[in-house]
From Swiss-Prot:
PANTHER family named among the record's database cross-references: PROTEIN PHOSPHATASE 2C, PROTEIN PHOSPHATASE 2C 70-RELATED
Sequence positions that bind Mn(2+) 2: D57, D271, D318
Enzyme class: hydrolase
Entry EC no(s): 3.1.3.16
Binding, Mn(2+) 1: D57, G58
Cofactor: Mg(2+); Mn(2+)
Recorded superkingdom: Eukaryota
Region described as Disordered: spans on this chain: 131-157, 330-362
SMART domains, sorted: PP2Cc
Protein's recorded name: Probable protein phosphatase 2C 70
Matches recorded under PROSITE patterns: PPM_1, PPM_2
SUPFAM superfamilies: PP2C-like
Coiled coil: none
């Protein structure tokens, strides 16, 4: 369900870049929706040997998705676990940190600036890529808390999915909360590296009910069709439960994959793509287009056009964002050069089973 334009906005925000180990392309499009609530981050050089890519699909407004695109990767860098090499813990804590940072006066002010109350963005400019200035990632951030009339702001009622991929040498870590998705192509076969967090999944349903929530027509408390998300603070108000056990939680599911020469690329995309095509269909589409098109951003644009519905209503009418990250032949050297920076691992099973992440190692 949603409010649609009389004609779709088909202008696209596109970009591409890379480093010694990979190259990427991305594109986003507002489509039939009246607003653009997707955001994304693409950083081939988060540090000298690490790349970071993320897609964020907002609901109830664009502020939370843009907040994540601006801040989540910086929190990964700042977390003490990151400096010790524990990428999984650093990204896990950074998801929860987003909820904390959006509270209080500073959170209210940032959300107001990024959302509808702040500067207006239209068309393709609403698809945000956060590009830190040289050295910005290394600067200690000022104390986040500040005093003001909104010091007791409990956080936003709007929210966002978050699906990020962190690549360090031959290790790929995917962290996901919500129904955006990351898919790996290995020898032409699609492997889901994330799981869509819908309320009717047994583990999600159990947590929702235990926290005092309910599910109606596949929606948490009759409103949200996601079981995990950043933001949505009205569904995280049980003071007797930790953050990971709230009705809706920002806790990401983590997946770690050791990359090999058989791995060709990953696709990160919001559900505007996955509602129209299966994981394997997207992988097949990308392979076919790459046979004749070298520009990955052009491939992304073609994928958006392929998914766009001819008329409003049904699949193909959502905002659409996609990032393709293509791996170069593995080498021992770290990813030291880059261009165009733009802004508990469970067992996996084959993609076609549709009951969880799939295992590229089987």
């Amino acid at each position: 369900m949603g409010v649609y334009l009389s004609t779709p906005k088909t202008e696209k925000y596109s970009g591409e870049g890379g480093n010694d180990r990979l190259r990427y392309g991305l594109a986003s499009m507002q489509g039939w929706r009246t607003t653009m609530e997707d955001a994304h981050t693409a950083l081939p050089r988060l540090d000298e040997c690490t790349s970071f890519f993320g897609v964020y699909d907002g609901h109830g407004g664009k502020a939370v998705s843009k907040f994540c695109a601006k801040h989540l990767h910086l929190q990964v860098l700042k977390n003490e676990a990151y400096s010790s090499g524990d990428l999984a813990t650093s990204v896990l804590k950074s998801f929860f940190r987003m909820d904390e940072m959006m509270k209080g006066q500073r959170g209210w002010r940032e959300l107001a600036e990024l959302g509808d109350k702040g500067q207006k963005f239209t068309g393709m400019l609403e698809g945000i890529i956060w590009s830190p200035k040289p050295g910005e990632s290394d600067k200690p951030e000022d104390t986040w808390t500040e005093e003001g009339p909104h010091s007791h702001f409990p956080g936003p009622t709007s929210g966002s999915t978050a699906c990020v991929a962190i690549i360090r040498n031959d290790e790929l870590i995917v962290a996901n909360a919500g129904d955006s998705r990351c898919v790996l192509s290995r020898k032409g076969r699609a492997y889901d590296l994330s799981k869509d967090h819908k309320p009717d999944l047994d583990a999600e349903k159990e947590r929702i009910l235990n926290a005092g929530g309910f599910i109606v027509a596949g929606r948490v408390n009759g409103s949200l069709n996601l079981a995990r998300a950043i933001g949505d603070m009205e569904l995280k108000q049980n003071e007797f439960l930790p953050a990971e056990r709230q009705i809706v939680t920002a806790e990401p599911e983590l997946n770690t994959v050791k990359l090999s020469e058989d791995d060709e690329f990953i696709v990160l995309a919001c559900d505007g793509i996955w509602d129209c095509m299966s994981s394997q269909e997207v992988v097949d589409f990308v392979h076919k287009e790459m046979n004749t098109e070298d520009s990955l951003s052009a491939v992304c644009e073609k994928l958006l056009d392929h998914c766009l519905a001819p008329v409003s209503g049904g699949d193909g009418c959502d905002n659409m964002t996609v990032i393709i990250v293509k791996f170069k032949k593995p080498s021992k050297s770290a990813a030291t050069s880059s261009t165009n920076q733009s802004v508990s691992s469970e067992e996996m099973r084959p993609n076609e089973l549709d009951d969880g992440p799939s295992d590229p190692n089987k």
